[in-house]
UniProtKB/Swiss-Prot annotation:
Biased composition (Polar residues): 1-12, 158-168
GO cellular component: a single term: cytoplasm
Major location (coarse): cytoplasm
Protein's organism: Mus musculus
Residue spans of biased composition, Basic and acidic residues class: 86-104
InterPro entries for the chain: A-crystallin/Hsp20_dom, HSP20-like_chaperone, HSPB9
Protein name: Heat shock protein beta-9
Listed PROSITE patterns: SHSP
Localization terms from the record: Cytoplasm; Nucleus
Length: 168
């Protein structure tokens, strides 16, 4: 596993977003076999359509009770892993002593057409962790075949025009 030092963040903030540092820095995927940790952004409002292009991939994970720093989202090739742990202890003389532990673990395989470097991760106030991504851009058809898609000259349309000129 290799870590790369550039960030997934586009530098643009979404409406209602508070940036909270994740406990692991974000890293970009330069090659398929590298591992990346996505930053978890905390949103002030629930996720809604904002008129932007819809993501080609999205998943919602129940992470109620977790803070962004409690969650780790990793991409390893085409595998996505979401893990989180949280502990809380109290020793209140009037209420007694208690210890609470909570964990979440989700793992799935990403579609091969997905661009892992374009993935975003947001945590809503209601505790939903949204992971969104776009498909990789495909090269134009010319680059795929190596041939130009120029229209042919002298096709059926031009021969019809010539016939109409010959027959007045």
């Amino acid at each position: 596993m290799q870590r790369v030092g550039s960030s997934f963040s586009t530098g643009q903030r979404e409406p209602g977003e508070n940036r909270v540092a994740s406990r692991c820095p974000s890293v970009a995927l330069a090659e398929r076999n590298q591992v990346a940790t996505l930053p978890v952004r905390l949103l002030r409002d629930e996720v809604q359509g904002n008129g932007c292009e819809q993501p080609s991939f999205q998943i919602k994970v129940d992470a109620q009770g977790f803070a962004p720093e409690d969650l780790v989202v990793r991409i390893d090739g085409q595998n996505l892993t979401v893990t989180g742990q949280r502990q809380h202890e109290s020793n209140d003389p009037s209420r007694g002593r208690y210890r609470m532990e909570q964990s979440v673990h989700r793992q799935m395989q990403l579609p091969p057409t997905l661009d892992p470097a374009a993935m975003t991760c947001s945590l809503t106030p209601s505790g939903h962790l949204w992971l969104r991504g776009q498909n990789k851009c495909l090269p134009p058809p010319e680059a795929q075949t190596g041939q130009s898609q120029k229209p042919r000259r002298g096709g059926p349309k031009s021969s019809l025009q010539n016939e109409s000129v010959k027959n007045p």
